[in-house]
UniProtKB/Swiss-Prot annotation:
The keyword Ubl conjugation does not apply. GO terms for biological process: ribosomal small subunit assembly; translation. It is found in: Cytoplasm. It comes from Frankia casuarinae (strain DSM 45818 / CECT 9043 / HFP020203 / CcI3). This is Ribosome maturation factor RimP.
Amino acid sequence: MGSADDQASRMREGTVEVVGAGEAGRARDRSPSGSARGRGGVRTALRARLAAGLADAGFDLEDVTVTRAGSRSVVRVVVDRDGGVDLDAVADASRLASELLDAAETDGQGLVAGPYVLEVTSPGVERPLTEPRHWRRAIGRLVTVRDRDGIVLAGRVLSADESGADLAVATDPARPGRPPRRRLARVTFAQVARATVEVEFSAEAYDDLSIESVETPSLSAVLVEPGETADLGYGEPDDDLPAAPGRESNDDGREAGPRGAAGKEMTR
């Protein structure tokens, strides 16, 4: 890493790079004579400068924020892409974003006045789903949706298009040896006030459902109050969706336990 004097010298030359787990950044000394804008204007200018260049490399610019950290600003850039963003992708996006900002300064369009640190990172797991592409990338994940009237629905994303998404919604608790009952629910994005992906420590496996020719209700028809369950009132339950295996019962109705040392089934 070098001595403190070496680090200070390199910082003055604008060549210090900072790379951390899950994010990459570059620290640069900038002249305080750069363009002075309000914070909202800086964000807009940064987004305009970065979005197209990142898109050409296959990245979606999800967010840009500018905050103060002591004598510097921190420019935080959030990127995503289909298939997810790993550390190598974050490093690539960081280099590209730094080059784009360097080019802006060379053109006399310094976007952030004074020294700043550039941080590039991927979205958090619980980031809001605000674009169709967010829903597409959340297929297979459990989400919680709140509509504009404050009513809540929870389900697993099965598919998504430009106007909405189809969820598998549990309607009854799982029975031993049987998967929980589920119904298809259609979520229309125009009705959604907020939607987030839920963190799961042990996610169940779900097979694809066939939703062709199924008349799915609107979000307002299937949303439930917190603590309640929804019964969408059409079709048979999708019991072919696997759940964690339950215990089996033998012929006389007693629950079958583990087998003994000799392989004989033990009952309780």
